[in-house]
Amino acid sequence: MGFQVLRSVIQAPLAKRSFLCKSCPSGLRVLYNNILLSSRSYSTKGSAFTLIKKLRQETNAPIFLIKEAVEETNGQSFFEAKSVLSEKMKARGQRLAQQLQGRVAKQGWICTAILPDAQAACMLELNCESDFVAQNPKIQRLALSSASSILHSLNRVNADSTEQRNVSTDLDSLKKIILHSDKDSSSNLGNTLFDAFSNATSTTGERIELSRAIVFQRTKPQHQLGRYTHGTDVRVHSSLGRVGCLVSLSNAQKAGLADDIAREFVAQDPESIDDFLHNTSVYDNSKTMKDLLGSANVVDWVRWERGQAQ
């Protein structure tokens, strides 16, 4: 009979439980309270598990860091846990980066970016230790977003420059640039490049390093900028590769000529511009490079291969 009363208490609406529970024998009241506490504990564990799963899917952070973040925020808020996790990821990434300083990082990507109006173009090299990590879509997206962020930042800084080439060898300054999406230059992903690289190191356990970067600016209307990268599946992204080139031409009459010339530089790897002009085109062996250029002149060019940064 007592258990029937207990069943009716458990199944009753919450507002009636306190009244009905008084009719239970004392032993059954204790059992009811234990059941209630157990269900609350299960509910809390369930919500924490859901939070851990969601954070893992969104950040790909190590599970032990996610659990720490959830525990420190009592598993109550996704956004609070994510904020704590972000700080933990940065700290772990910086510690790992120090530990991994001596490790060789020659894999990764040469990445290019160009403004929609072709007023400026950027090329950078982002390195990691293994091809496995380089093939991670998050690392590929980091390279693309970094190139776009550097391009827009340096183009604004050098907007009044009369120099055709703007080379930044101060990588520490570049790492202070705020990262934005390569798909939306007005976006703000909330991290500097340094923070983003630290997070990537924390996630992958590998050294993630910006090795070099360069920006070309078109300072005269008759100049044309071009870019080309080679060495990856086009389904990954046409702006990523093992080899890349930026080119600046003057008096270019044909649209897209600078891109074509950049492709030739990548294929030929000439030692000098004189050698290049007298070479036969890789893509049209009936013409020399001088023929392809026509009235255009090569003002500047840079060709990089992955893993060869000094």
Curated annotation (Swiss-Prot):
It is found in: Mitochondrion. The keyword Mitochondrion applies. Belongs to the EF-Ts family. GO terms for cellular component: mitochondrion. Coiled coil: none annotated. Signal peptide: none annotated. One of its GO terms (molecular function) is translation elongation factor activity. GO terms for biological process: mitochondrial translational elongation. It comes from the Eukaryota. PANTHER family: ELONGATION FACTOR TS, ELONGATION FACTOR TS, MITOCHONDRIAL. This is Elongation factor Ts, mitochondrial. Residues 1-42 form a transit peptide. Associates with the EF-Tu.GDP complex and induces the exchange of GDP to GTP. It remains bound to the aminoacyl-tRNA.EF-Tu.GTP complex up to the GTP hydrolysis stage on the ribosome. Keywords: Elongation factor, Mitochondrion, Protein biosynthesis, Transit peptide. It comes from Schizosaccharomyces japonicus (strain yFS275 / FY16936) (Fission yeast).
